[in-house]
Amino acid sequence: MKDLGVGIVGCGVISTIYMQNLASFRGVRLAACADILEAPARTQADKFGVRALSIDALLRDPEVEVVVNLTTPNAHFEVSHSALTAGKHVFSEKPLCVTVEDGHRLVHEANRRGLRLGCAPDTFLGAGGRLAREIVDGGKVGSILAGSCSLMSRGMEHWHPNPGFFFQRGGGPILDMGPYYLAALCNLLGPVESVQAKTSIGYAERLVTAEGPNKGSRIAVETPTTIMALVRFVSGADIVLTMSWDVWKHGHSPIELYGTNGSLRVPDPNFFGGTVEVTERSEDWQLLDTSTRPYGKPNWRSPIWPASAPDRANYRCLGIADLASSVLNGTPHRSTAAFAAHVLEVMNAMLQAGADGGTVRIASRIERPAPLSDDEAATYWGGQAA
């Protein structure tokens, strides 16, 4: 099987798991990396045995066929657009970009040039997301009527060495973490029809306590840090969504869906595995372990946590492998830019509804991605058992 050369632009914290995982996926090969700053690019290049280039040089490099855009959100549009105009396929970290208009421009540019444009999250393609999709599609819980979705924490300044961008326009919990939850929901339920929301800024300033050169500095918060939304799907399902970086502790499940025949709990959509829980009518919850399915086995533990055995399934790059397979085999890929642009429109609609009040209608419509079977998923992996 031919490998596509991959160039990574953006060598920050998230780049390590991408560079580490790329070596285990079939159809892709890490060729080079670049960053607006030379030092982080050189550090990652030396660590993973690839070339460190300038961004312009990477975009011109004939060995690079797929550009993976890991820059900060406010640079996503410029880097992805430049890569497309250079004739490269692109896979971007979430969000696709900051504005809905720029998202549509990227989708149009990729389509016009016949290039593949993908976007994280790809976590819904993991073992937990696939099993949840099987349960919903199989009708085990009936038609989904309602649900809840929660991401709440103290924020990013306690662990990230350079957290300023999280609190600028294009950041906040909805644009940073919302894509995981909304992509998981759209994969299960289809497109969103409308949103209502309330938003607030819990703290006007954030004190950086993470180790690093910014420790002790203060960040002025420019974007809402709590979003509470009612999301109406075209299917008729209503989901209550809460995203907040103003919460010390809570007890909510990441995603719960309530159907006509039962209920479903979907594991943390920031990762690829976890335990899916399902109940039929008033029966007890059934706990369904996904660790024996492709991309369900724990392989990672956060470096900021005390050392211990891996406890999370973190197979970032699965969407890149799916995109590469689509290029090599002429098949559709799943984490598409159109899908990500719909999610982006929904997130921006929440911010608009929070600022203006009322209901914001979603203009775009998307099809759910084709289900990824365990057998097909396994063909993407070339490393140790996933």
Regions found by a protein language model. Give the residues of each.
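C-terminal glycine/acidic-rich active-site capping loop/insertion
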Residues: 204, 208-222, 228, 233, ...
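N-terminal Rossmann-like dinucleotide-binding module
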Residues: 1-48
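Predominantly a Rossmann-like dinucleotide-binding segment in NAD(P)-dependent oxidoreductases
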Residues: 123-220, 357
